């Protein structure tokens, strides 16, 4: 099993805060020279610890002001129904997150839209999907906390295989 030490955790925390940091700045922040720092980053990419680097956009600046949580219950929770629903949802760009849940509902979606009219069209689409039994939605009034950085133990950790 591969272990991540304090230095690896420091690298990951720095990259989670600013993925555009230069390797030289990153190396300085964890007290390494640039080459070993670069090698550690590459190793964590190869292990799948670092999946990708992205740019986070402002939904508000882009007019995506309607943040809705949608609870979806299916008629039957059988593999074929679940798979079909998940395939449909995966094609929708407004669906930011989708989780298969325990209990009721079967799925929880977070959808980001520009208007109530767009939400109405999306809900109309959902109601027409085969196997959908019930839909409930809740609007987010205010985002109290949002983060993308994962909580990592400062002392290091062992990776799962």
Swiss-Prot record:
It comes from Pseudomonas putida. GO terms for molecular function: sequence-specific DNA binding. Residues 23-42 bind DNA. GO terms for biological process: response to amino acid. Signal peptide: none annotated. The gene is bkdR. This is Bkd operon transcriptional regulator. The keyword Secreted does not apply. PROSITE patterns: HTH_ASNC_1, HTH_ASNC_2. Pfam families: AsnC_trans_reg, HTH_24. Positive regulator of the bkd operon for branched-chain keto acid dehydrogenase complex. GO terms for cellular component: cytosol. Keywords: Activator, DNA-binding, Transcription, Transcription regulation. Residues 4-65 form the HTH asnC-type domain. SMART domains: HTH_ASNC (SM00344).
């Amino acid at each position: 099993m591969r272990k991540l030490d304090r230095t690896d955790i420091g690298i990951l925390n720095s990259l989670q805060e600013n993925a555009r940091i230069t390797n030289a700045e990153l190396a300085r922040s964890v007290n390494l020279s640039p080459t070993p720092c670069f090698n550690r980053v590459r190793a964590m990419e190869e292990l799948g610890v670092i999946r990708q680097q992205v740019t986070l956009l402002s939904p508000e600046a882009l007019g995506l002001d309607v943040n809705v949580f949608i609870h979806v219950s299916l008629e039957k929770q059988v593999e074929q129904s679940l798979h079909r629903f998940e395939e449909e949802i995966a094609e929708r760009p407004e669906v930011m997150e989708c989780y298969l849940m325990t209990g009721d509902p079967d799925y929880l979606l977070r959808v980001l839209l520009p208007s109530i009219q767009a939400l109405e069209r999306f809900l109309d689409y959902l109601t027409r999907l085969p196997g959908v039994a019930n839909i409930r939605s809740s609007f987010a009034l205010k985002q109290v906390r949002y983060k993308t950085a994962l909580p990592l133990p400062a002392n290091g950790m062992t990776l799962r295989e």
